[in-house]
Amino acid sequence: MRIAGVDLPRNKHVVIGLTYVYGIGRTTAKKILAKAGVPEDKKVSEVTDDEANEIRTIVTNEYKVEGQARSEQQLAIKRLMDIGCYRGLRHRRGLPARGQRTRTNARTRKGKRKTVAGKKKAGKK
């Protein structure tokens, strides 16, 4: 089954399969399935064409997914950077934006360690 340009894994439950689409998490997937009248425990391979089309129409008409969601996210971050708020500055510098410590443990945002020249060890006399 293909939704919003993403092939859903056929061996998983529909509620889990839908989370492979960017912008759809577990809660949203459950809401979509409830609206479409598809049971959550059904496998993706067992979904009928009518049910798949119903899910597809709900996703395309009511939710921002994939490229649309990504671009909206990028625009929100760009807006923060443009107005020069604290969060925008943190994004611009590539540092954590939500108050985490940065003296140690900020490697995900900072990237690989860059060694800085330090003090030389004193030799024995």
UniProtKB/Swiss-Prot annotation:
Recorded GO CC terms: cytosol; small ribosomal subunit
The keyword tRNA processing belongs to this UniProt entry's keyword annotation: no
GO MF annotation terms: rRNA binding; structural constituent of ribosome; tRNA binding
Region of interest (Disordered), residue spans: 91-125
Annotated keywords: Ribonucleoprotein, Ribosomal protein, RNA-binding, rRNA-binding, tRNA-binding
Claim: rRNA-binding is one of the keywords in the record: yes
Single Gene Ontology BP annotation: translation
Assembly mode: Part of the 30S ribosomal subunit. Forms a loose heterodimer with protein S19. Forms two bridges to the 50S subunit in the 70S ribosome.
UniProt record similarity statement: Belongs to the universal ribosomal protein uS13 family.
Functional description taken from the UniProt entry: Located at the top of the head of the 30S subunit, it contacts several helices of the 16S rRNA. In the 70S ribosome it contacts the 23S rRNA (bridge B1a) and protein L5 of the 50S subunit (bridge B1b), connecting the 2 subunits; these bridges are implicated in subunit movement. Contacts the tRNAs in the A and P-sites.
Protein known as: Small ribosomal subunit protein uS13
Gene this protein is translated from: rpsM
